[in-house]
From Swiss-Prot:
The keyword Disulfide bond applies. The keyword Disulfide bond applies. Disulfide bonds join C7-C19. Belongs to the GBP/PSP1/paralytic peptide family. This is Paralytic peptide 1. Hemolymph. It comes from the Eukaryota. One of its GO terms (molecular function) is cytokine activity. Keywords: Cytokine, Disulfide bond. Pfam families: GBP_PSP. InterPro entries: GBP_PSP. It comes from Manduca sexta (Tobacco hawkmoth). Causes rapid, rigid paralysis when injected into Lepidopteran larvae. The physiological role may be to reduce hemolymph loss following injury and promote wound healing.
Length: 23
């Protein structure tokens, strides 16, 4: 799947444009 944030599965895009794990 492709998300707007461009992060890998299980990751969330933060306000500063980085990808952080949500687990």
């Amino acid at each position: 799947e492709n998300f707007a944030g461009g992060c890998a599965t299980g990751y969330l895009r933060t306000a500063d444009g980085r990808c952080k794990p949500t687990f």
